[in-house]
Amino acid sequence: MDGPNFAHQGGRSQRTTELYSCARCRKLKKKCGKQIPTCANCDKNGAHCSYPGRAPRRTKKELADAMLRGEYVPVKRNKKVGKSPLSTKSMPNSSSPLSANGAITPGFSPYENDDAHKMKQLKPSDPINLVMGASPNSSEGVSSLISVLTSLNDNSNPSSHLSSNENSMIPSRSLPASVQQSSTTSSFGGYNTPSPLISSHVPANAQAVPLQNNNRNTSNGDNGSNVNHDNNNGSTNTPQLSLTPYANNSAPNGKFDSVPVDASSIEFETMSCCFKGGRTTSWVREDGSFKSIDRSLLDRFIAAYFKHNHRLFPMIDKIAFLNDAATITDFERLYDNKNYPDSFVFKVYMIMAIGCTTLQRAGMVSQDEECLSEHLAFLAMKKFRSVIILQDIETVRCLLLLGIYSFFEPKGSSSWTISGIIMRLTIGLGLNRELTAKKLKSMSALEAEARYRVFWSAYCFERLVCTSLGRISGIDDEDITVPLPRALYVDERDDLEMTKLMISLRKMGGRIYKQVHSVSAGRQKLTIEQKQEIISGLRKELDEIYSRESERRKLKKSQMDQVERENNSTTNVISFHSSEIWLAMRYSQLQILLYRPSALMPKPPIDSLSTLGEFCLQAWKHTYTLYKKRLLPLNWITLFRTLTICNTILYCLCQWSIDLIESKIEIQQCVEILRHFGERWIFAMRCADVFQNISNTILDISLSHGKVPNMDQLTRELFGASDSYQDILDENNVDVSWVDKLV
């Protein structure tokens, strides 16, 4: 390590360099010369140079909390050249202290950046261990919205390897019974669940890579899951989930095969890398057993899901599901009940987890019950391996539920990955194509409609994720021949009307992106008049959707009696999609998507900028109203939409198309909502700081009665805030950063 240099003057040594880099070089991630009093980089740029000394080190507890929030990822070292990735040397049993049951004593390893020692010392309390069956050679470099404080080593190797010593592995265990069944069909209630066809690459027995330890622990898990309830020797009581990956243990030379090249295994490994939810649960007693949950509370979770989420994604047969759920006598031990298919168990737990988040947003659960969503997701993920192996329409349903739950992770990468898997599986199953006459004769009307609804649910989910991230969709509207959903009985007409509205809005968002923001839109050699004609045509379509839906709602409201109006107001507390405010908010947000700077129109004319500024203020007014009424879900979809509005407001301020003084309330409201996301959403907190600085500047101007003595200085402050905001977005790979540098 480089040390300080000393110059000898008059028999005395004087230090000429510092031990550690200056603050500016650290922030810019540049190599610092460490010269005294000013380093070469700062001297060259005329910047102030200060040496804060060694960065403060975090304690083990602080590191553990940071890893749970996703702020800290241990950096791995490169393997030595020529070293075999699968070493034949045995792992010494004395490398880690063992508890009475053979589990490794919890705590951080002193070699936490060393790959070999990491694999020897897997801890049940470490949230980033090999859970969900994560393979040791899986990449860790998953983009995160809250990784703004993480410094990634450019030379770090994302791969690590297990020692091939068979004695260090858990003895092989069989796959779940549902996986080993022959190719027959098991039915339960309204569900037909075909047993999976396992690829020839998949061995009959799967070798387990354990979560708790990789020494001689012979405990068997259920259905590929392993929950540690042991409390000896100070081990943690928090159960952690481990879904076993495939590995072939029949190789005579002691080496193990890689992940089989089949769709389910590849998708499982991908999910284990990107999705971090449902891995632990805090809903446990001191002895490690799960706490009891009131049955009525679980029923409320299910009801909340069908009142809110089901209207957007109608892939579940509501009547059949509720009838089957009514036969469950013990929800808490459902994961051990062999009388129900694994896919049904997964759906029950995940639907309750999603319903819990809905009631949590509406303020209808106590603070102690808020952690139940993670506990229920934990129970659902115990069946994830069996679900992903099916590779059928049931897999699509379960992945959609998992995708909806992933919205509440403080990152968009997991939902983006899930949406890609869903859409490719959907296309592979041919769900985007209308059934032929021959197939329709062999299917009931209920089965055909269920198939169509699964596709449109997948379509809405994938379009929602893509448009929120500002990315291209995986399927074009011209490749879809499936008819729209239709009501099979009277009671679901209202729900299906909302579903059709969501489909039209998703289609509209996709059309705007394709014709205005896509790369192909920017390559067209069009005149200004032709570009304006495209935007005007899309504006007309959007206005028609809004007008038609507004008229439908007015007509329906006029036909309601007093009892129906009271019931409707109660439903609106849970499902906000029926409110006029939500419809106006979505209308304004799509107008922003249409008029903001784009590939088609990089520099909008002044009249378009004025229209854009008006829709920005309208969209924010409606967003803040929903927020105050507890109708705004605090998930990453809301965050990205908020950032898009913030981005547009900032652009309009720099272009002086929004009055600076009149926008001070909206700017402060931006700060309030961004900060309400909480400490887990560090990315949102940093963006809030930028807008707080803008709000302070506007406040100073308003106190001076609108007089700006130095307009150039104000412009520089706005441009500086814009650059700072763009830098935060760039650091986190956030694609809402669509504005070019303003010069």
UniProtKB/Swiss-Prot annotation:
UniProt-recorded Gene Ontology molecular function terms: DNA-binding transcription factor activity; DNA-binding transcription factor activity, RNA polymerase II-specific; sequence-specific DNA binding; zinc ion binding
Compositionally biased region (Polar residues): 85-99, 155-198, 239-249
Keywords: DNA-binding, Metal-binding, Nucleus, Transcription, Transcription regulation, Zinc
CDD domains referenced in this protein's UniProt entry, alphabetically: fungal_TF_MHR, GAL4
One Pfam family hit: Fungal_trans
Domain of life of the native organism: Eukaryota
Gene Ontology annotations of biological process type: cellular response to oxidative stress; positive regulation of transcription by RNA polymerase II; regulation of transcription by RNA polymerase II; transcription elongation by RNA polymerase II
Annotated DNA-binding residue span(s): 22-49
InterPro entries: Transcription_factor_dom_fun, Yeast_MetPath_Reg, Zn2-C6_fun-type_DNA-bd_sf, Zn2Cys6_DnaBD
Location of the protein in the cell: Nucleus
Segments of this protein annotated with the region Disordered: 81-100, 155-249
Keyword Cytoplasm on entry: no
Keyword Mitochondrion: no
Bias (Low complexity): 213-238
Cellular component, GO annotation: nucleus
Note: Present with 279 molecules/cell in log phase SD medium.
Function: Binds to SIN3.
Record protein name field: Protein STB5
Classification lineage: Eukaryota, Fungi, Dikarya, Ascomycota, Saccharomycotina
